């Protein structure tokens, strides 16, 4: 694990979904880099973050470069996989069309996407989105390939013009506000289509994005195709839901156990109060209650710690309603744990 300065991140609103139910024992915790704290080994991640936001990184002898994807498309692909476990990668591509870069751009062709989704490795060509405005005699760029810096691109275009490597351009101007808008002004006699093709050829207005879908599987690096990435995500969510359900089941069983003790106390309220009052110490009162009513230590402790006024004022109807509701929850949670189809249904509903 890395030191904090390497792992700090500003979290957006969507990040809360990555941490959802983390306090319900849904994932394992491990010591942090200096063994002073515990940190999650992996996040519950209610949405498929690795595919949606992508990942880039290098290590000794390996690298990963997973492009970002459209959230809705990825979720549709996951749901389709849950509904049809035999779905092929080609069929998945009807849902997940390809990478969805935040800066836009146009992916040229689908062969690179298909290769990446099938083998885990591929290369795609991304072009800037540009329009030729003939009346104004200029090219307007509204989208750039992923990770291309607009200011550096404009500077480089001007350098190419100055060095005579690209002809037909008089100047560049940045008119961006909330939207990207880079203006490339042309000479009167320039052929805009030729200039644009030269810009694609000689500048970052056309870039190659090498896809390497490498991820850690059981702490081991592995190249994954699209179907494998989705399968591992579904399996992770199944594990998270099973662990969350077990946590909720334990909490409800503990609550039901307490309510059973309260029911006994209410049915024998006068004797219970007398036993508590006649006991010299709290441990003595607990022992007396456990011996007389076959209560557990947890039940006896809860009764003894309750103020006598509150104990005598407990309403049997409310306790009974709470108990019946809790038992229904327990039944439902046990049904989930006994049926994988119900678990997968919850995976789908959570998405």
Regions found by a protein language model. Name each.
Residues 2-9, 13-17, 22-25, 55-56, ...:
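C-terminal interaction appendages of subunits in large macromolecular complexes
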């Amino acid at each position: 694990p890395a030191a904090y300065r390497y792992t700090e991140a500003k979290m957006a609103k969507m990040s809360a979904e990555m941490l959802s139910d983390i306090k319900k024992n849904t994932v394992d915790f491990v010591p942090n880099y200096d063994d002073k704290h515990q940190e999650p080994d992996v996040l519950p991640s209610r949405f498929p973050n690795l595919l949606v936001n992508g990942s880039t990184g290098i290590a000794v002898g390996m690298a990963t470069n997973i492009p970002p994807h459209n959230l809705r498309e990825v979720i549709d692909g996951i749901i389709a996989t849950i509904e049809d476990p035999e779905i092929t990668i080609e069929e998945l591509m009807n849902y997940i069309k390809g990478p969805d870069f935040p800066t836009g751009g146009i992916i040229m062709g689908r062969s690179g996407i298909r290769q990446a989704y099938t083998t885990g490795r591929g290369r795609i060509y991304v072009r800037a989105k540009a329009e030729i405005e003939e009346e104004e005699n200029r090219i307007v760029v509204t989208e750039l390939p992923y990770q291309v810096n607009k200011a550096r691109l404009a500077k480089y275009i001007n350098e190419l013009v100055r060095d005579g490597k690209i002809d037909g351009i008089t100047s560049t101007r940045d008119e961006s506000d909330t939207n990207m808008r880079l203006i490339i002004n042309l000479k009167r006699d320039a052929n805009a289509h030729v200039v644009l093709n030269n810009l694609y050829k000689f500048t970052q207005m056309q870039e190659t994005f090498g896809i390497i879908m490498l991820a850690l599987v059981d702490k081991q690096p592995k190249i994954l195709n699209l179907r494998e990435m989705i399968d591992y995500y579904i399996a992770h969510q199944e594990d998270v839901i099973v662990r969350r359900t077990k946590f909720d089941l334990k909490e409800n069983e503990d609550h039901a156990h307490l309510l059973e003790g309260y029911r006994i106390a209410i049915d024998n309220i006068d004797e219970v109060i007398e036993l508590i009052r006649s006991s010299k110490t709290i441990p003595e009162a607990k022992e007396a209650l456990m011996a007389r009513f076959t209560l557990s230590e947890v039940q006896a402790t809860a009764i003894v710690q309750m103020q006598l006024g509150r104990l005598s004022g407990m309403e049997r109807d409310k306790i009974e309603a709470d108990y019946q509701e809790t038992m229904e929850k327990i039944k439902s949670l046990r049904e989930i744990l006994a049926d994988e189809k119900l678990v997968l249904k919850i995976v789908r509903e959570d998405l």
